[in-house]
Regions:
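S-adenosylmethionine-dependent methyltransferases
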Residues: 1-136
Length: 136
C-alpha cells in the first residue's frame, strides 16, 4: 500500500515486491482502485540483490519487520541497497522489537546517515510508530 500511495501522490514509478505471490493480485487491485500503475514481483528479501536494487532510487517498506529473523534480513537488505547506490531507504513500523533491533543496528553501522523518526496519528485512529531512514 505504501508504494501505491507513492505512485499516486508523487507520480513515482513503483515496483511492489512480496514473497507471497498471492499478495500480487491484491496489490494490483489496490493500484487499480487508486488509478495508478505499478509493477509487481514475487521476490524474497534475500532475492533483492545489489544488481537488482541498483535500478531504484528509493526503497520503502511498511509493516515488514514483524518476526525476529527479519531484523537480520532487513539489515542485510539495507546494506545491499546502500552498496547498490540507493539514495534513501525508509522502513516504517509500529515499533515491534525486531524493528527496534534493525534500527539500532543501522544507526551503529551508518551513524548520522541513519535516523529514526517517531510518528503519532490522532485521526482517523490513534496510532504510533517509527520510520527508519537511511540516507547513505
Amino acid at each position: 500500500l505504501l508504494g501505491i500511495f507513492c505512485a499516486g501522490r508523487f507520480d513515482s514509478r513503483v515496483t511492489g515486491v512480496d514473497a507471497d505471490e498471492n499478495v500480487l493480485p491484491y496489490m494490483e487491485l489496490h493500484a487499480d482502485v487508486n488509478n495508478v500503475k505499478i509493477a509487481g514481483e514475487k521476490r524474497t528479501f534475500q532475492q533483492l540483490s545489489v544488481d537488482y536494487l541498483s535500478q531504484f532510487d528509493v526503497v520503502v517498506g511498511a509493516d515488514i519487520c514483524f518476526w525476529d529473523e527479519m531484523a537480520g534480513m532487513l539489515f542485510n537488505l539495507t546494506h545491499r541497497a546502500v552498496k547498490a547506490g540507493v539514495k534513501q531507504i525508509m522502513i516504517a513500523d509500529p515499533c515491534r522489537p525486531p524493528f527496534s533491533d534493525l534500527s539500532e543496528r543501522c544507526q551503529k553501522r551508518y551513524g548520522d546517515n541513519a535516523e529514526v523518526e517517531a510518528m503519532w496519528l490522532s485521526r482517523p485512529v490513534r496510532a504510533s510508530g517509527e520510520i527508519l531512514i537511511v540516507k547513505p
